[in-house]
């Protein structure tokens, strides 16, 4: 069921910037987004970038010690969100980076919000082409343990996430 909600150009631009890892200067790398939240506009007609809800690559190791824990704290208690998280992880063979699409729908979110976000999920996923991993979570218990995300990224082959052993 489609909701008729449109995906803003800003969302697509952020996604493309996060997806493309072209050779960049160290300053450009620092400005790249590590994690972002997307929300519905006030009129509920567009999916937009949520102001101030982002982690930059340059913040990691500076103002952000653990980007995954910081990301989890950005999720609202009582409303839904979409998110993109640029996961850095290690398997037994190599280090990897992958974008993860996250649909956050906490159980205490208003029913109308859950319905609009759920019915708009396909619209945003169609615009974010090439995402290999998706995580849907309905409570903090499902996201606060980094093993949940590691499971989506590669199961038991993943040995660390964001430099923290599992």
Swiss-Prot record:
Classification via InterPro entries: ADF-H, ADF-H/Gelsolin-like_dom_sf, ADF/Cofilin
Processing and modification events after translation: Inactivated by phosphorylation on Ser-3. Phosphorylated on Ser-3 in resting cells. Dephosphorylated by PDXP/chronophin; this restores its activity in promoting actin filament depolymerization. The phosphorylation of Ser-24 may prevent recognition of the nuclear localization signal. Phosphorylated via a ARRB1-RAC1-LIMK1-PAK1 cascade upon active ligand stimulation of atypical chemokine receptor ACKR2.
Top-level division of the source organism's lineage: Eukaryota
Modified sites of kind Phosphothreonine: 25
GO annotation terms (biological process): actin filament fragmentation; actin filament organization; actin filament severing; cytoskeleton organization; establishment of spindle localization; mitotic cytokinesis; positive regulation of embryonic development; regulation of cell morphogenesis
Covalent link (Glycyl lysine isopeptide (Lys-Gly) (interchain with G-Cter in SUMO2)) residue numbers: 132
UniProt modified residues of type N-acetylalanine: 2
Record key words, sorted: Acetylation, Actin-binding, Cell membrane, Cell projection, Cytoplasm, Cytoskeleton, Isopeptide bond, Membrane, Nucleus, Phosphoprotein, Ubl conjugation
Sequence ranges assigned to domain ADF-H in this UniProt record: 4-153
Keyword Protein transport: no
Biological role stated in the UniProt entry: Binds to F-actin and exhibits pH-sensitive F-actin depolymerizing activity. In conjunction with the subcortical maternal complex (SCMC), plays an essential role for zygotes to progress beyond the first embryonic cell divisions via regulation of actin dynamics. Required for the centralization of the mitotic spindle and symmetric division of zygotes. Plays a role in the regulation of cell morphology and cytoskeletal organization in epithelial cells.
Family to which this protein belongs: Belongs to the actin-binding proteins ADF family.
Name of the molecule in the record: Cofilin-1
Lineage of producing organism: Eukaryota, Metazoa, Chordata, Craniata, Vertebrata
Gene that produces this protein: CFL1
């Amino acid at each position: 069921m489609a909701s008729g909600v449109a995906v803003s150009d800003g969302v697509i631009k952020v996604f493309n910037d996060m997806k493309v890892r072209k050779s960049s200067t160290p300053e450009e790398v620092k400005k790249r987004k590590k994690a972002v939240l997307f929300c519905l506009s006030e009129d509920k007609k567009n999916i937009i970038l949520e102001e101030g809800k982002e982690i930059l690559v340059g913040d990691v190791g500076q103002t952000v010690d653990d980007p995954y824990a910081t990301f989890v704290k950005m999720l609202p208690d009582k409303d839904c969100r979409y998110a993109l998280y640029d996961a850095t992880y290690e398997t037994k063979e190599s280090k990897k980076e992958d974008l993860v699409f996250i649909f956050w729908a906490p159980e205490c979110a208003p029913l109308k919000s859950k319905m609009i976000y759920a019915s708009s999920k396909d619209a945003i996923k169609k615009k974010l082409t090439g995402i290999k991993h998706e995580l849907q979570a309905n409570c903090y218990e499902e996201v606060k343990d980094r093993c949940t995300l590691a499971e989506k990224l590669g199961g038991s082959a993943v040995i660390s996430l964001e430099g923290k052993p599992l």
